[in-house]
Amino acid sequence: MAENGAAQENQVTKHQEVGHKSLLQSDALYQYILETSVYPREPEPMKELRELTAKHPWNLMTTSADEGQFLSMLLKLIIAKNTMEIGVYTGYSLLATALALPDDGKILAMDINKENYELGLPVIQKAGVAHKIDFREGPALPVLDLMIEDKNNHGTYDFIFVDADKDNYINYHKRIIELVKVGGVIGYDNTLWNGSVVAPPDAPMRKYVRYYRDFVLELNKALAADPRIEICMLPVGDGITLCRRIS
């Protein structure tokens, strides 16, 4: 029995590792995915940034390694060139994007905390992709409002990734749907929100999970009803919903 208890304790420890946002019920299966498919193919700069971010006190905010790999593949499949990222943190998903884009690709990156971005910036610079990034410190909504005032910005983005304040996801969608091109893709992160989207309202959950839960539910409902997009919700990381603009 002691051996089984130790195994269970070890499994719990693995489930809490940095960047582990998988909704898989089996930690062993998630580790298999990481060790078989993700880590062996993870570019060295991304590995370096992942390990650097692991030392940060807010490391659970980072994009998981399997989601980073997924984003990289997606960007290459849609041949993205002009992209946007709302919510950067230390830049793991930003680096995945920058590495996936062609040399003349561009990323407009926005975050309210430049200090976190600067933690990962030396790694991004060493990877030789910093020239693709236009980082703006501050809230994204005012920047988006200015952008949509200029019709020349409409329909110019191939891909937009949102991993920021969940209470503004609806507000972001209202704006960026005008900026992404028809046939382009928007990715919303955390749309399964720690699995809380199917939990009873009185279920025990962390305060931040409970606070943002209704905003995530509101977003999911709105995306499902939006006739301008096709959607696909995937259980990658903490849930990511892809929206392909069709009109």
UniProtKB/Swiss-Prot annotation:
Pathway: Aromatic compound metabolism; phenylpropanoid biosynthesis. It catalyses: (E)-caffeoyl-CoA + S-adenosyl-L-methionine = (E)-feruloyl-CoA + S-adenosyl-L-homocysteine + H(+). The keyword Methyltransferase applies. Binds 1 Mg(2+) ion per subunit. Substrate binds at K21, D163, N194. Induction: By wounding and viral infection. InterPro entries: Cation-dep_OMT (IPR050362), SAM-dependent_MTases_sf (IPR029063), SAM_O-MeTrfase (IPR002935). A divalent metal cation binds at D163, D189, N190. Expression increases from the bottom to the top of the plant, with a pic in the middle part of the stem. Pfam families: Methyltransf_3 (PF01596). Its cofactor is Mg(2+). Keywords: Lignin biosynthesis, Magnesium, Metal-binding, Methyltransferase, S-adenosyl-L-methionine, Transferase. GO terms for biological process: lignin biosynthetic process; methylation. It is an enzyme of class 2 (transferase). GO terms for molecular function: caffeoyl-CoA O-methyltransferase activity; metal ion binding; S-adenosylmethionine-dependent methyltransferase activity. Its EC number is 2.1.1.104. S-adenosyl-L-methionine binds at T63, E85, G87, V88, S93, D111, A140, D165. Methylates caffeoyl-CoA to feruloyl-CoA and 5-hydroxyferuloyl-CoA to sinapoyl-CoA. Plays a role in the synthesis of feruloylated polysaccharides. Involved in the reinforcement of the plant cell wall. Also involved in the responding to wounding or pathogen challenge by the increased formation of cell wall-bound ferulic acid polymers. Methylates almost exclusively caffeoyl-CoA. Belongs to the class I-like SAM-binding methyltransferase superfamily. Cation-dependent O-methyltransferase family. CCoAMT subfamily. This is Caffeoyl-CoA O-methyltransferase 6. It comes from Nicotiana tabacum.
